[in-house]
Regions:
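Beta-propeller domain segments
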Residues: 3-45, 127-289
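Asp-box/WD-like beta-propeller blade repeats and closely related beta-sheet repeat scaffolds
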Residues: 39-46, 66-115
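Residue-level detector of Asp-centered blade-edge/turn motifs that repeat once per structural unit
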Residues: 50-53, 115-118, 170-173, 257-262, ...
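Conserved beta-propeller blade signature
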Residues: 54-58, 120-124, 175-179, 263-267, ...
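Short coil/turn segments at the loop-to-beta-strand junctions that recur within blades
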Residues: 90-95, 161-164, 208, 296-300
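Aromatic- and glycine-enriched pocket-lining scaffold segments that form the walls
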Residues: 106-128, 137, 142
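Conserved blade-ending motifs and adjacent loop-strand segments that build the rim/top face
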Residues: 285-307
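Blade-level signature of beta-propeller repeat domains, shared across WD40, Kelch, NHL, RCC1
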Residues: 302-326
Length: 326
């Protein structure tokens, strides 16, 4: 079934949203042995972007045996046959069994795509739980990259990210809003300036308002906190403070702008909610305000705002929901 909700007012004037939706049946059972090539679920599509006749797909790639990164494909859009070529990849990868931090999670991989213009795409990559790489300028992990479509060259525009899952480009003011999963708490909304002349560093895994899983009192975390202290200040350690952080974690996902200037919405997985907020880029202080939390009742994996409608991709029921603003 398909159900539409039409709001006669702005969303923060409502108390809740009760959604029905279009539901999709699973067509394959990936626990079947014949799908063992999925490597325990580490293979995954992260994002799809279609712009001006081109399609971009990001995914987790096994670069060599048991060693992974997040890569990007592109193709001309064709409804009969699509031939993809590699727009971005790297020989650098994180080995799921043999790495410095002795941890691995390919779901912590970013993969958000923003088409900036005819020459540039922006691309986020998580740290795969290889924390030290987020603070290495020579590594692709824990970064937001600017990639040239013509020659495949790239440069790092920001670093110190854990799992940058959401990106929104404000074309008028030329900045990005980035939504990032924290560890145990500490989900962030960050502002990345695209006219900045140096790499912007957001602090992971030196500073974070979250904690390592299990917290400081867990014996197994002693060495982890020595290497990655998760200071409760970014600016005191030379990093950029988040615009907003969430404790406890909301399981932050995509972030987008709405039709009215300075109005945005960020989605959540764990909290099953939308957070509508106002942000004034031109103000230095008191520039951020959450004006409404709207309960949806499901994990919201992604969303698109188009033609005064908000389309939600709901994970629990593999469904689409549409919210109209009139």
């Amino acid at each position: 079934m398909h159900y539409k909700i039409t709001y006669p007012c702005m969303p923060w004037e409502l108390d809740y949203a009760l959604l029905s939706f279009t539901q999709f049946k699973k067509s394959r059972h990936f626990d079947d042995p014949k799908y063992s090539w999925l490597k325990g679920g580490w293979y995954s599509i992260k994002d799809v972007e279609i712009f001006d006749g081109d399609i971009y797909v990001s995914y987790t790639k096994e670069v060599k045996e048991n060693c992974w990164n997040t890569s990007l494909l592109s193709a001309k859009m064709n409804y009969v046959y699509i031939h993809f070529t590699t727009l971005f990849t790297s020989e650098e990868c994180v080995n799921e069994y043999d790495n410095i931090d002795d941890e691995y999670n390919a779901h912590q991989s970013g993969g958000r795509i923003i088409n900036l213009n005819n020459e540039i795409v922006l691309f986020s990559i998580g740290d795969f739980r290889s924390r030290y790489q987020a603070q290495s300028e020579s590594s692709i992990f824990g970064k937001v990259l600017k990639i040239n479509k013509k020659n495949n060259d790239y440069e790092v525009i920001s670093m110190g990210h854990r799992n940058p899952q959401g990106l929104f480009y404000n074309e008028d003011k030329n900045f990005l809003l980035e939504a990032e999963h924290g560890p145990q708490g500490g989900d962030e909304i960050n502002v990345i300036k695209l006219d900045y002349n140096s790499i912007q560093n957001f602090g992971w895994a030196i500073s974070s308002y979250g904690e390592h899983y299990g917290g400081k009192n867990a014996p197994e975390n002693k060495n982890k906190y020595e290497k990655y202290p998760l200071h409760k200040s970014h600016s005191e350690h030379g990093f950029i403070e988040p615009l907003k952080y969430f404790n406890p974690s909301i399981g932050i996902s995509q972030i987008i702008g709405l039709a009215n200037e300075n109005q945005y919405v960020v989605a959540s997985l764990k909290a099953h909610s939308l957070y509508f907020f106002e942000y004034n880029y031109n103000k230095k202080e008191n520039n951020f305000n959450i004006v409404k939390k709207l309960d949806i009742g499901e994990r919201i994996r992604d969303m698109i705002y188009y033609n005064n409608k908000l389309y939600l991709y709901l994970e629990d029921t593999a469904s689409l929901a549409e919210i109209s603003f009139n």
